[in-house]
Amino acid sequence: MTDVYRVGYLERVPLGTPYPSIVAHLGSLLGRLPDAELVIDYTGVGRPVFDMFRISGISPIGVLITGGATETHEGFVHGVPKLTLISRLQVLLHEGRLKIHKDLSEAETLVRELQDFRCAFTAAGALTFNARSGRHDDLLLALAIAVWRAADGGMSNPGLFRYYEQQYLKLVGGSSKPRDVVGVDLGQSRDPTAICIVRRISDPVDHIPLREPRPPPQPGNLEWSLIEREKL
């Protein structure tokens, strides 16, 4: 069974929008996607903003982006290495399984963020991933955490669950239900809040015009090109 990840919604909330307004806006979006999960970047804003969602009746999953190599889990918050998040996007790009709806207003912005993202080694020899100096990566991070969760990130024994699901679907002749995840990189003083909605589809039928990311020109190079300026 092949999974494809479709980016169907991208938004950058105006800079300076108060967090209560962002919470209300996301509540409205989730109201239109009743089965969707909300995943937010817990790294910069921490517990106070996370609790705003819970008080409003929304139960998000927090992702604390780390520089390590191992995922951790405490309550509703998962510590996820940035290497894990970015390498997963790389794999999907190479395999042609990350697709973007062609008419999204922020699609070009996301492309630029992907192109501006760089890998580098610290003095201690650790591999790091960061946006080029002076550039934003909010849409990229919203996409990365949404894809992480849509790919069963943070779940216990996801492979076993998918196996039994597939066996059941074979018996009844059905197909896997699409999985929607809303990823949010909460902005701070100089960065806007970014929202990305990803849908995971198994054995999809390509009937919607999409932009398909292209793999990087050289293996392992993060400087890939998702789309070219051409008519689809």
Residue spans of the language-model regions?
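RNase H-like, metal-dependent nuclease domains and their acidic two-metal-ion catalytic environment used
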Residues: 1-64, 71-75, 83, 96-232
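Catalytic cores of nucleic-acid endonucleases
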Residues: 79
